[in-house]
């Protein structure tokens, strides 16, 4: 099924540092500008997935190889515009059915640093929803988005997916405990989705938590100005804000600096503060090898392949639907228009009797064709 009109280009934590992934981030205006350019090259839809682990661009186009090359070149251009030193990362590229397999693996958490991470499935669904809302989706991408959701729901029903707290918040907690112990007092800056997950997990594991946010009062949050007052009472500060540029400076903190865990993308901590305090960023969190439950990995991979097989079958059926519809239209035309015309003027033969028999033959023919189509669909 590699003739599927799909291509996917991206980089993850294994291919590119946080700064390179962050340089690819696009607001909706940038997505629309890219989509306008791509339409000129035969692209009918664009889905943009951006997480702390990866940035991926999925497109629908009959010219998969050419469009994938364009997307890869655009990524390199973004890095050149950012003025990064050193060689640029090498994006990965998938076409046709390989794009679907990779996407299902991402949704299942097989491509995440933490095996079975669940949050990425929700992020992927929101990426498809954003594409539909912004009118840069198409029927092929809509169907694929629905199928990725089905794969995830099946994983959850069968218990193969990871626990909810198996994302970057778990990595942050592990880093804090390695540096500050099991009873570390933790401040969390930023109460977006990731910040709230951090608060929930840290509190669940028995840590004393203080919350800080640009908008104080949200979820019991204190204003950012309060961080400096509390620094002496904090062992670690987890920064989970989503600013486009680094903003947390030395002046925001008190005399005694806690360990800082920066899980923002791009980095939220300025270089001067990172030099002054012990700072752990996403790149430092996403290194090394985590213990892998091989049985669980195999279970996830098996479910992904089953989902891919189901998707393949659905595409075959969807492609044959027009054959079935055309067959029905042909039968109706022959049986109720052309056959009566052909039987006009017959002498001694009873036209009604002949017409009934001919309709019966045509009905049998139609059913035989339909069965053949269904058998072909099942065999594929």
List each language-model region with its residue ranges.
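Rossmann-like NAD(P)-binding element
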Residues: 225-249, 259-261, 265-266
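Glycine-rich adenosine-cofactor-binding loop
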Residues: 148, 164-206, 213
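Internal alpha-helical scaffold of NAD(P)-dependent oxidoreductase catalytic cores
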Residues: 69-87, 129, 133-136, 147-151, ...
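A glycine-rich (often HGG/GG-containing) alpha/beta subdomain
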Residues: 1-112
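Adenosine-nucleotide cofactor-binding segment
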Residues: 191, 206-230, 241-244
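Adenosine-phosphate binding glycine-rich loop
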Residues: 22-28, 39, 254-259, 263-379
């Amino acid at each position: 099924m590699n003739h599927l009109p799909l291509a996917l280009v991206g980089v993850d934590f294994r291919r590119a540092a946080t700064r390179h992934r962050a340089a690819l981030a696009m607001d909706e205006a940038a997505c629309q500008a890219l989509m306008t350019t791509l339409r000129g090259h035969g692209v009918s839809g664009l889905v943009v997935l951006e997480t702390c682990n990866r940035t991926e661009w999925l497109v629908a186009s009959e010219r998969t190889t050419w469009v994938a090359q364009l997307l890869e070149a655009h990524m390199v251009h973004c890095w050149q515009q950012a003025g990064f030193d050193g060689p640029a990362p090498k994006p990965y590229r998938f076409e046709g059915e390989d794009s679907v397999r990779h996407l299902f693996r991402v949704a299942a958490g097989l491509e995440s640093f933490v095996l079975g991470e669940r949050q990425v499935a929700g992020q992927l669904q929101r990426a498809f929803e954003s594409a539909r809302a912004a009118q840069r989706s198409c029927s092929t991408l809509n169907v694929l988005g629905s199928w990725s959701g089905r794969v995830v729901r099946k994983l959850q029903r069968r218990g193969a997916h990871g626990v909810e707290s198996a994302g970057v918040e778990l990595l942050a907690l592990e880093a804090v405990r390695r540096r500050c112990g099991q009873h570390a007092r933790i401040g969390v800056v930023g109460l977006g989705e990731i910040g709230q997950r951090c608060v929930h997990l840290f509190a669940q594991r028995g840590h004393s938590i203080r919350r800080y946010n640009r908008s104080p009062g949200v979820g019991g949050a204190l204003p950012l100005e309060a961080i400096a007052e509390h620094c002496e009472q904090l062992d670690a500060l987890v920064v989970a804000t989503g600013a486009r540029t680094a903003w947390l400076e030395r002046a925001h903190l008190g005399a005694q600096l806690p360990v800082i865990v920066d899980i923002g993308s791009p980095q939220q901590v300025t270089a001067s503060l990172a030099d002054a305090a012990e700072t752990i960023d996403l790149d430092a969190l996403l290194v090394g090898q985590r213990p892998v439950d091989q049985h669980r990995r195999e279970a996830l991979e098996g479910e992904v392949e089953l989902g891919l097989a189901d998707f393949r079958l659905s595409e075959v059926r969807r492609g044959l639907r027009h054959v079935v519809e055309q067959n029905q239209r042909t039968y109706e035309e022959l049986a109720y228009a052309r056959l009566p015309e052909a039987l006009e003027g017959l002498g001694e033969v009873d036209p009604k009797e002949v017409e009934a028999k001919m309709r019966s033959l045509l009905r049998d023919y139609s059913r035989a064709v339909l069965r053949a189509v269904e058998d072909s669909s099942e065999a594929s």
